Amino acid sequence: ALTGADASIPGAGLAAADARLDDLLAPELLSLPLRALLKKVGDALDGAYPMDLRSIRATPLPAEASGFAQQIQQMATAFGIHNVEAYVSTAIGPSCIPASAAPPRLVFGSVLLEKGIDETARTFLVLRSLKLLQARAATLSRTAPIDLWPVVAGMLTVFAPTWQAPGVEPKKVAEHQQRIKGALVRQLDDDVPVLAMEVIGSIGNRASQLGTAVNQWGNRTALLAMGSPAAALIGIAA
């Protein structure tokens, strides 16, 4: 793969989308309580920090990309995701960005729709993003590292209001807390405060690494599916 030649390693295909593999594929930082918490409150994070499609001039995939759109839907089904809204933008380069999980939205750089594109690498990018949608980790994946701890602290204090996050201004935490509270649109399960306390006890000072960790999780899932280190290298570099 390092020389550009693909290794002969069969991938697991769409079986890699099975959430039962999460314990094996998720980095250590993404503990079981944190993954469970994201499953329950990740939609609120997406709502609190929406990706502005207008600012990047994103438009729906063109009609001539209908075949690719069908492939996206087929892959998404394996992740338990349906009716993916796919957009294209000239502003984001050769990448696929998971915008939100509810509704499920992906944004592609326009170069990924050009003729001659490496379709294997493009598929890798789609699979990686679909994993992040399945995990409800889209917002974490695209938040700047410097902002991750205030955002995560705000999320945790929604469910553990007496906890004081170290190393971040209380005013900033309160701002994020209110933003996330405003995006909660349904009653959450009774175990959410317990999960939040477990995350508080384990995350330490590593919140700024969460974006890297969730993207690693997506990369591992896509690599398992594809079995192609060359495609992974191209996709990760995008």
PLM segments and residue spans:
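Hydrophobic or amphipathic, alpha-helical segments that drive membrane association/targeting
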Residues: 1-105, 111-116, 120, 135-140, ...
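Short alpha-helical catalytic segment bearing the HExxH-like zincin motif
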Residues: 107, 121-129
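A broad, structural surface signal
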Residues: 127, 220-223
